[in-house]
Amino acid sequence: MALLDTIELFSNFSLSGVFAGLVLASLLTTTYCIWNIFYNIYLHPLKGYPGPKFLTTSRLPYLKWMFSGTLVPNFQRLHEQYGPVVRVAPNELSYINPEALKTIYGHRQPGEGFRKNPAFFQPATNGVHSILTSEGDAHSSVRRKILPAFSDKALAEQQDILQHFTDLLIRKLRERVEASKSSEPVDMFEWYIWTTFDLIGDLAFGEPFNCLEAASFTEWVALVFNAFKTFAFINISKQLAPLDKLVRLMIPKSMKARQDKVFSLNVAKVDRRIASKADRPDFLSYIIKGKDGVAMALPELYANSTLLVLAGSESTASGLAGITFELLKHREAQKKAVEEIRSAFKTEDEIVPESVKRLPYLAAMVSEGLRMYPPFPEGLPRLTPRQGAQICGQWVPGGTYVQFSTHAAHRASANFTDPNVFAPERWLGDTKFASDIKEASQPFSIGPRSCIGRNLAYLEMRLILARMLWSFDMQLTPECEDWDDQNSWIQWDKKPLMVKLSLVKR
């Protein structure tokens, strides 16, 4: 009997202890949350910056927007309401002032630079950092090795390759139009992405992906194209510490498998290009030779070739689609572009990379299209140096996340007159837009980490658009009137851009 009484006593004690422990843990958690909210609102070093209270208390609303793909419109709304700098999370500020752009991303003295958010920029599948994710001296070293592939000399030598795939695009579209009796619309984003993938495949690996010939996504390209969202979700999950490992377990294994397969296929293509020893002006021919006698190691080459394909294809195709959409929605601008292009050339053969550089309205149209629809609309997060920094005349403590919100800056009335109106004239000296702060439009960023292939991208877009407007009359279908109403996960989640094409009669 005494034994049973003892067991019951310990059992009650154990249950009471567990209950007391749960109550204590609950109280401590509640106390911590209340204290954290109080601290973030009233005591945090960023307490003086404008922004809604619900964003200053927790990072969860910010991450919810990231996961749902609604970060871009929400940031635009915040800046419209609160001004050029907004506190978007307890320890993060968003800017739309171009002075902040220069401070955050521009050239700075050693030790004073703004580091990339380590949670957002992870190494490639093989664990090696690319030009996108490397820091400091390592980044400078990688950039020096890649830069010759994007020099003016290289660009001049690559123009025949660019011309070839532009010719192929126009020929395939012409064949499709001639074969279609009912002027069936085509998805121009698909045709643009097939073109840029074929081009970048040829430049990166010495062989195209043959998307244009097949008029479809090949298996490899489909994997790469779908990998963007995978990369976005994996990177976002890493910002949820200490729950990041749990969240990553919830990401379907198929998404990670696609990422791994893309990398392994890239490795095979790099190996095949190196083994061929071909003498042609593609990216690898310059990178393999090295810079100042220092060549890129093979693991580094694998990591960077994957990035070159991802960044070099999607961004240009997005830009082309966005510009096409804006142009077809604005008939007067379309008319001016068509008149400039069709009056500048007597034959289609005259439309080459060098000749399109001399068309001012075409250049303005591209600049305005990229302002309205930047391929990567979200900000690029950075960490302030340990000693802190002055941004737009205000002190920001060290270890603070800061970013220049690209799309919000491009659409801000503080930076542009009629910011939501597509007006190429703003880039041509029209006095109506004299107060525009044009340096606020930076679709390819600035500074030592700006897009290394921006000159190639601009040339591609000008050439392809000139050829399209020379060859076809184009009309947007009614269902695509709101095509630019899109979510984004690093890049835009694009819908089909359905356009009716008809051959120009000459």
UniProtKB/Swiss-Prot annotation:
CDD domains linked to this entry: CYP60B-like
Localization annotation: Membrane
Membrane-spanning residues where?
18-38
Which PROSITE patterns would you find in this protein's record?
CYTOCHROME_P450
Keywords in UniProt for this one?
Answer: Heme, Iron, Membrane, Metal-binding, Monooxygenase, Oxidoreductase, Transmembrane, Transmembrane helix
Q: In which pathway does it act?
A: Secondary metabolite biosynthesis; terpenoid biosynthesis
Q: Which reaction does it catalyse?
A: 4-O-demethylbarbatate + reduced [NADPH--hemoprotein reductase] + O2 = proatranorin II + oxidized [NADPH--hemoprotein reductase] + H2O + H(+); proatranorin II + reduced [NADPH--hemoprotein reductase] + O2 = proatranorin III + oxidized [NADPH--hemoprotein reductase] + 2 H2O + H(+); proatranorin I + reduced [NADPH--hemoprotein reductase] + O2 = proatranorin IV + oxidized [NADPH--hemoprotein reductase] + H2O + H(+); proatranorin IV + reduced [NADPH--hemoprotein reductase] + O2 = atranorin + oxidized [NADPH--hemoprotein reductase] + 2 H2O + H(+)
- State the Gene Ontology BP annotations: terpenoid biosynthetic process
Where is this protein primarily located? membrane
Q: Does the keyword Lyase apply?
A: no
Q: What is this protein called?
A: Cytochrome P450 monooxygenase atr2
